[in-house]
Amino acid sequence: MPSTKFKGYFITIEGGEGSGKSTLLNQLGDYFRNKGFEVIQTREPGGTKLGESIRHLLLNHEDSISIGHQAELLLFLAARAQHIEELIQPALKAGKIVLCDRFNDSTIAYQGAARGLNAKKIQEFCQLVCAEILPNWTLFLDVSPEIGLARTQKIQKVHAQMGQLDRIESEKIEFHERVRQAFLSLVQQEPQRIYRIDANESQSKVLQKALEFLEEQWSDSELKT
């Protein structure tokens, strides 16, 4: 089990578009609450009033604002800095489980590998923003970009959004393939922290795999609280 100076645990869920992160986040939240844990569910960018405003700016087509790659990176990091200070760190200090949809790994994959920004500089920026706030464990939901984007469009049509993809979802398929390959590389670099799950499987199978991994990380006494 990774060492931590906080009483709580920080679990992040990563993956490309349409990989099922939000669904798994909700399922894990229910699971841990039923075990008696206090749980915070959050997302990036977002999680705070400032973060959600930045999210709208970054993802929305409506405003017709041109955002350069470096500006995009810094906006994501600004949202994260506020997220950590306002929500994540206090929750971890209070002994809660924090479940977060995206964190540093997404920045490395999207702004680094896919956008082509300097990987070393991104690591330095992330370290500056996060300091000691790092995930105990990360679940990477691996799905092909073609399948993931098709899922996303289907979900949006169901919610009467006319299947419109957001600013990042609408990037070319090559962009999303670079994102996937970056995540796979991170899994190889940090196998003890990051666990790959085949997100082409059913939602129940994905949840089963996630719980099997997480249950191995905790002692029985902690999980049976």
Curated annotation (Swiss-Prot):
The keyword ATP-binding belongs to this UniProt entry's keyword annotation:
yes
List the Pfam families hit by this protein, alphabetically: Thymidylate_kin
Q: Keywords, A to Z?
A: ATP-binding, Kinase, Nucleotide biosynthesis, Nucleotide-binding, Transferase
Recorded hits in Gene3D superfamilies, A to Z, give: P-loop containing nucleotide triphosphate hydrolases
Enzyme Commission code: 2.7.4.9
Q: Which SUPFAM superfamilies match?
A: P-loop containing nucleoside triphosphate hydrolases
Residues the entry annotates as binding ATP: G15, G16, E17, G18, S19, G20, K21, S22
Q: Provide one Gene Ontology cellular component.
A: cytosol
Q: Does the keyword Nucleotide-binding apply?
A: yes
Record GO terms (molecular function): ATP binding; dTMP kinase activity
GO BP annotation list: dTDP biosynthetic process; dTTP biosynthetic process; dUDP biosynthetic process
Q: Which reaction does it catalyse?
A: dTMP + ATP = dTDP + ADP
Q: Which residues form a coiled coil?
A: none
Q: Which family does it belong to?
A: Belongs to the thymidylate kinase family.
Q: Which HAMAP family does the UniProt record give?
A: Thymidylate_kinase
Outline what the protein does. Answer: Phosphorylation of dTMP to form dTDP in both de novo and salvage pathways of dTTP synthesis.
What protein am I looking at?
Thymidylate kinase
Provenance organism:
Protochlamydia amoebophila (strain UWE25)
Q: What is the lineage of its organism?
A: Bacteria, Pseudomonadati, Chlamydiota, Chlamydiia, Parachlamydiales
User: What gene makes this protein?
Assistant: tmk
